[in-house]
UniProtKB/Swiss-Prot annotation:
Residues 32-115 are periplasmic. The keyword Transmembrane applies. It comes from the Bacteria. The gene is mzrA. Keywords: Cell inner membrane, Cell membrane, Membrane, Transmembrane, Transmembrane helix. Interacts with EnvZ. The keyword Cell inner membrane applies. Its main location: membrane. This is Modulator protein MzrA. GO terms for molecular function: protein kinase binding.
Length: 115
């Protein structure tokens, strides 16, 4: 049995390069995926965060589908299925929440690069 001698050694760099190319291509969809995330923060230190269940009920009543709501330090992070849901939620949340809350698109690229 001669598995390494079944092909010429000059093919080895091409096989390794091909393997790296396949790995890179398979990872591209996960790297290019855009998260649809809204972040709610308080603008004044010490102010309480809104209740996540209340926000879920209000957004659901408006027909906005939520994937998840999670606390993250001094913020609530809300994940949505698509960008339209995220934009609609931002409009509803800005009307719903009183002054003192910051509702913004959350950039997860910074968090992913640190992980």
């Amino acid at each position: 049995m001669k598995p390494l001698h079944a092909f010429p050694k000059r093919w080895l760099p091409w096989l390794i390069g091909g393997a790296f190319a396949l790995v890179a291509i398979s990872m591209m969809p996960s790297l290019m995926r855009h998260e649809n995330v809204v972040q709610i923060r308080v603008s004044h230190a010490g102010a309480p965060m809104p209740d996540g269940f209340y926000l879920y009920q209000q957004l659901s009543a408006q027909g906005i589908r939520i994937k998840s709501i999670t606390p993250s330090g001094d913020a609530l992070i809300i994940h949505f299925d698509n960008e339209e849901q995220s934009l609609a939620a931002q409009k509803v949340l800005r009307r719903l929440l009183p002054d003192g809350f910051i509702v913004a698109q959350h950039d997860q690229a910074a968090h992913l690069s640190l992980a």
